[in-house]
Swiss-Prot record:
Pfam families: tRNA_U5-meth_tr. Keywords: Methyltransferase, S-adenosyl-L-methionine, Transferase, tRNA processing. HAMAP family: RNA_methyltr_TrmA (MF_01011). PANTHER family: TRNA/TMRNA (URACIL-C(5))-METHYLTRANSFERASE, TRNA_TMRNA (URACIL-C(5))-METHYLTRANSFERASE. The lineage of its organism: Bacteria, Pseudomonadati, Pseudomonadota, Gammaproteobacteria, Enterobacterales. The keyword Methyltransferase applies. It catalyses: uridine(54) in tRNA + S-adenosyl-L-methionine = 5-methyluridine(54) in tRNA + S-adenosyl-L-homocysteine + H(+); uridine(341) in tmRNA + S-adenosyl-L-methionine = 5-methyluridine(341) in tmRNA + S-adenosyl-L-homocysteine + H(+). The active site is at residues 324, 358. This is tRNA/tmRNA (uracil-C(5))-methyltransferase. Dual-specificity methyltransferase that catalyzes the formation of 5-methyluridine at position 54 (m5U54) in all tRNAs, and that of position 341 (m5U341) in tmRNA (transfer-mRNA). InterPro entries: MeTrfase_TrmA_AS, MeTrfase_TrmA_CS, SAM-dependent_MTases_sf, TrmA_MeTrfase, U5_MeTrfase_fam.
């Protein structure tokens, strides 16, 4: 497999191998059979980063082989969205003959949406000035005239220049409703939009008929918060990354949702607040005791939940856990399964043709643990 080719004829086989591996990992927890959610076999990634190689008069995207570190020229990126591939060709054609855009260009990042928007970030090993801005604006206008809904950003050491804005608005149809998600350049977004919709709809199905309020840790830009808000009286969500919190507030307003509250703090800090170990100014205007959270939703980083957070999570009757690392998920389940039973299990093929697996579990408190 190379970035320009994918073994599409082996897609089902690689997915079956992941499903078998997950099944084996979940045997100890008596989990039900996993629901399997397939990715598109090609053109599934909505974002991509490439180094830029200067070869005399030529200029092209490259990646490095993860094993040999050999340089690989990339003219077509089969995992990337059709818009990424179209823009890759447009950018190289435009930049090669233009010294102001080409000089010491080091990297190009692409962020695209299913709704046809794109942010292209040009990263340089030199200062950027007004001449660069004017030249970049000319390229932006030329591409817009050809129908591209595009934004440009220039980055250099301690410098970020954006001509209009530094984000795109993604529009996803989730269980019959269209949701708007601001996605800010250089902040986390779900890379596989199709699988993201599957995850959102699975989470909605898992919380059908839920009671009371929802507590969410690691909410990002409100990806799950906004979709799940329809099933709960109120949603209280935490996130530590400043850009993601700003995007979450934007998304709440854009979708006219009035029952979601975002707090900028880490899961560990929120655990301390819930245990009344520390007081936080950020929670001053929020009456935690007024929330009737019967369900908690967690989508932690690869490291999973720390021990204190696992202990806090166990207090909730229903736990919805999205994991990008089955190993840390299993480590957490070794504790959570003492008080809760896995009612649902899902495998989301977020990264086809790799060993990575995205999983979802719904845990419900055992009657004996009440």
């Amino acid at each position: 497999m190379t970035p320009e080719t994918l073994p599409i004829d082996q897609y089902e086989q690689q997915l079956a191998e992941k499903a078998a591996r997950l099944r084996q990992m979940m045997l100890a927890f008596q989990a039900p059979e996993a629901q399997i959610f397939r990715s598109q076999p090609a053109h599934y990634r909505m974002r991509a980063e490439f180094r830029i190689w200067h070869d005399e008069d030529d200029l092209y995207h490259i990646m490095f082989d993860p094993q040999t570190k050999a340089r690989i020229r990339i003219d077509h990126f089969m995992p990337g969205s059709p818009l990424i591939n179209a823009l890759m060709a447009e950018m190289m054609t435009a930049i090669r003959p233009e010294p102001l855009l080409r000089a010491k260009l080091f990297q190009i990042d692409y962020l695209t949406t299913q709704s046809g928007e794109a942010v292209v970030t040009l990263i340089y090993h030199r200062p950027l000035d007004d001449a660069w801005r004017e030249c970049a604006a000319g390229l932006r206008d030329a591409l817009r005239a050809r129908g591209y809904h595009i934004q440009f950003i220039g980055r250099a050491n301690k410098t970020k220049i954006y001509l209009d804005r530094d984000y795109v608005d993604e529009r996803l149809t989730v269980a019959g409703r269209t949701l708007i998600y601001q996605q800010i350049e250089n902040s986390f977004t779900q890379p596989n939009a199709g699988i993201n919709v599957h995850m959102l709809e699975w989470a909605l199905a898992a919380t059908e008929g839920a009671q009371g309020d929802l507590l969410e840790l690691y909410c990002g830009n409100g990806n799950f918060s906004l979709a799940l808000a329809r099933h709960f009286d109120r949603v209280l969500a935490t996130e530590i990354a400043k850009l993601s919190v700003e995007a979450a507030h934007y998304n709440i307003a854009a979708n006219h949702i009035d029952n979601v509250q975002i707090v900028r703090m880490s899961a560990e800090e929120f655990t301390q607040a819930m245990r009344k170990e520390r007081e936080f100014t950020r929670l001053k205007e929020i009456d935690l005791q007024s929330y009737r959270c019967e369900t908690i939703f967690v989508d932690p980083p690869r490291s999973g939940l720390d021990e204190a957070t696992v202990s806090m999570v166990q207090a909730y009757p229903q736990i919805l856990y999205i994991s990008c690392n089955p190993d840390s998920l299993c480590r957490n389940l070794s504790t959570l399964s003492t008080t809760h039973t896995i009612e649902r299990l899902a495998l989301f093929d977020q990264f086809p043709y790799t060993h990575h697996m995205e999983c979802g579990v719904l845990l419900v408190r055992k009657a004996t643990a009440v």
